[in-house]
C-alpha cells in the first residue's frame, strides 16, 4: 500500500504540472486581458500534433519539441491578431461563443490536415524506461521528466513575472490596464505576447501528453474544464495560485481514482465500486472547489488589483 501511495502521488504531481501548463496561460489571459478563452484545449491538441509531426520529420524527439513550441506560439499570435482582438470590448458571452467556435475550427482543421485517425508518438530509449525514485520504487522516466519540466516552467514563469521588465508590464496590465496604457505601455502588443505565451504553454502540455496517450482530434478538451477549476481555486490572474491549485487537483483526482474504488469494495460489489469510485473522485474536485469558494470567494491566492 505504501509503495502504491508513493507511485500514485507522483502520478498526481505529474497530472498537476500538466494542468498547470494549461492553467498558467489561461489565468494570465483572463487576469490581464479579461478574456474568457475556451481555446486552450485546442492549443494542447495543436501542440501535440505539431510535436508528433516534427519529431517524425526530424527524427529527433528533443529537436521536434524545440521546434513545436515556437510553432504553437506563432499559432497563438495569429489567433490573437485575427480573432481575439475584435472581442476585447465585447461581453463575455460573445467571447465564449467565439472561442467555442475556435474549438470547432481547430478540430476540423486537424481532421483536414492530419485525418481522423490517431497518431502515436514514440519515446527515445533514454527516457522510455524506469528509474528508481526510492529503493524498490520504479517510476517511468518520461513521467518524471514531465514533473521536472513542469517545475522548471513554473520557476521560469515566476522569474519572468516577478523579476523582469516584461513581468512588470504584465503585472501592470493585470492591475490596471487603462493606467498602464496611459503611461505608454503598448497594451495591444502585450496582449499578443501574453496570449502567445499562454498558447506555447498549452502546446507544451500537449507535447508532453502525446507520448502518454494517442494524439487525436479533441484530445485537449477534457483538460479544459479542469484548467478552469484550477484557476478558480487558485485565484484568477495568480500564477502561484494556479500552480498550487493544479497540484491539489492533480493529487485529488489521481489518488481518488485509485483509492476510492478500493475503499468502496468493502461496502459494495467490486464492479459497482470500480464504476462509482472514479465518478466520486471527479465529484471531489468540484466539491473541493465549492468548499474553497465558500471561505475564499476569490480563490486561495487572488491576484492583487488596483
Which role does the model predict for each range below?
Residues 59-70, 192-202, 206-207, 212-286:
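Transmembrane alpha-helical segments in multi-pass inner-membrane proteins
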Residues 1-21, 50, 58-64, 90-95, ...:
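Membrane-interfacial amphipathic/re-entrant helices at transmembrane-helix boundaries
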Residues 48-53, 69-75, 102-110, 149-158, ...:
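Hydrophobic core segments of alpha-helical transmembrane domains in multi-pass membrane transport
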Residues 59-102, 109, 244-249, 253, ...:
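Alpha-helical transmembrane segments within multi-pass membrane transporters and channels
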Residues 86-163, 190, 255-284, 298, ...:
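Transmembrane helix-bundle core of multi-pass membrane transporters
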Residues 10, 32-78, 82, 263-273:
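Membrane-embedded helix boundary and interhelical linker motif in transport proteins
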Amino acid at each position: 500500500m505504501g509503495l502504491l501511495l508513493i507511485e500514485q502521488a507522483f502520478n498526481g504531481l505529474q497530472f498537476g504540472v500538466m494542468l498547470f501548463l494549461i492553467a498558467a496561460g489561461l489565468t494570465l489571459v483572463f487576469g490581464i486581458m479579461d478574456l474568457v478563452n475556451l481555446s486552450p484545449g485546442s492549443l494542447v491538441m495543436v501542440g501535440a500534433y505539431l510535436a508528433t509531426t516534427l519529431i517524425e520529420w526530424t527524427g529527433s524527439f528533443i529537436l521536434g519539441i524545440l521546434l513545436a513550441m515556437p510553432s504553437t506560439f506563432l499559432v497563438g499570435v495569429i489567433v490573437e491578431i485575427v480573432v481575439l482582438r475584435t472581442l476585447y470590448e465585447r461581453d463575455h458571452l460573445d467571447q465564449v461563443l467565439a472561442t467555442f467556435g475556435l474549438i470547432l475550427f481547430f478540430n476540423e482543421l486537424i481532421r483536414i490536415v492530419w485525418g481522423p485517425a490517431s497518431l502515436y508518438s514514440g519515446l527515445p530509449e533514454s527516457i522510455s524506461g524506469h528509474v528508481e525514485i526510492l529503493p524498490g520504487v520504479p517510476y517511468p522516466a518520461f513521467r518524471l521528466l514531465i514533473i521536472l519540466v513542469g517545475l522548471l516552467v513554473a520557476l521560469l514563469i515566476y522569474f519572468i513575472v516577478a523579476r523582469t521588465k516584461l513581468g512588470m508590464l504584465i503585472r501592470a496590465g493585470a492591475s490596471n490596464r487603462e493606467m498602464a496604457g496611459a503611461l505608454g505601455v503598448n497594451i495591444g502588443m502585450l496582449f499578443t505576447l501574453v496570449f502567445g505565451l499562454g498558447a506555447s504553454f498549452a502546446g507544451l502540455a500537449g507535447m508532453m501528453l502525446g507520448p502518454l496517450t494517442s494524439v487525436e482530434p479533441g484530445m485537449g478538451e477534457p483538460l479544459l474544464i479542469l484548467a478552469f477549476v484550477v484557476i478558480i481555486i487558485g485565484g484568477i490572474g495568480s500564477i502561484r495560485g494556479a500552480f498550487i491549485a493544479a497540484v491539489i487537483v492533480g493529487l485529488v483526482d489521481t489518488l481518488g481514482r485509485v483509492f476510492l474504488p478500493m475503499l468502496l469494495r468493502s461496502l459494495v460489489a467490486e464492479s459497482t465500486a470500480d464504476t462509482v469510485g472514479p465518478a466520486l473522485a471527479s465529484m471531489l474536485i468540484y466539491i473541493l472547489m465549492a468548499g474553497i469558494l465558500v471561505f475564499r470567494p476569490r480563490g486561495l491566492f487572488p491576484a492583487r488589483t488596483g
